[in-house]
């Protein structure tokens, strides 16, 4: 499966100057909503991701995603795995569990995102689940931006990664884009203003 080509064909592989949800800057942005707006394609991708997870024989009960970007990917993955789905959401800048969702003590979760950059939002969701008595057994995403180690791709962990080293991350592919702090961003130095798409922007 050529994930990069799928993103390009869907108009989801964007070039410009972007402020990522992690606070970093990048010349490229992956707009997964453009991929997931096609239900058949969303199902195909998450069916494939479910097969990868199943091949590692990890036992889990439910899937949780951080809103907003992770909801479609998480729901489709839950469908493919025949598991329960819940989501966390940000209220006053803090991740929380609302809408009557509950976590049973000992319930095992995979945290699912559309894209994992440093893994900050996924880690926030994991901490919520664990604070309520759940157990996080792994992470999943359509794509990894190259910072977190991916179990099925055998890709290494980089310094910016926030996901726990002892839990696996499963994805369909890696996109290795350079990301920058605002202070050393070459696009900022050229006078270009970063726009804020995605989970914490428009």
From Swiss-Prot:
Pfam family, one: Pribosyltran
One annotated GO biological process: 'de novo' UMP biosynthetic process
GO molecular function: magnesium ion binding; orotate phosphoribosyltransferase activity
Transmembrane segments annotated in the record for this chain: none
CDD domains: PRTases_typeI (cd06223)
Cofactor: Mg(2+)
Keywords, comma-separated and alphabetical: Glycosyltransferase, Magnesium, Pyrimidine biosynthesis, Transferase
Similarity field: Belongs to the purine/pyrimidine phosphoribosyltransferase family. PyrE subfamily.
Name of the protein this chain belongs to: Orotate phosphoribosyltransferase
UniProt organism field: Campylobacter jejuni subsp. jejuni serotype O:2 (strain ATCC 700819 / NCTC 11168)
């Amino acid at each position: 499966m050529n994930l990069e080509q799928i993103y390009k064909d869907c108009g989801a592989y964007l070039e410009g100057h972007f402020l990522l949800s992690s606070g970093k800057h990048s010349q490229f942005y992956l707009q997964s909503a453009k991929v997931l707006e096609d239900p058949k394609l969303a199902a195909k991708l998450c069916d494939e991701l479910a097969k990868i997870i199943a091949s590692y024989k990890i036992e889990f009960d439910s899937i949780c995603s951080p809103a907003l970007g992770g909801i479609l990917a998480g729901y489709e993955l839950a469908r493919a795995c025949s598991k329960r789905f819940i989501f966390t959401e940000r209220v006053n800048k803090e991740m929380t569990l609302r809408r009557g969702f509950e976590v049973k003590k000992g319930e095992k979760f995979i945290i699912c995102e559309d894209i994992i950059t440093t893994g900050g939002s996924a880690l926030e969701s994991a901490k919520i689940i664990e604070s309520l008595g759940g157990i996080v057994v792994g992470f999943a995403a359509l794509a990894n931006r190259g910072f977190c180690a991916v179990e099925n791709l055998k890709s290494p962990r980089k310094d910016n990664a926030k996901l726990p080293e002892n839990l696996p991350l499963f994805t369909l592919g890696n996109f290795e884009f350079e990301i920058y702090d605002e202070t050393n961003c070459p696009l900022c130095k050229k006078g270009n203003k970063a726009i804020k798409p995605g989970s914490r922007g428009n």
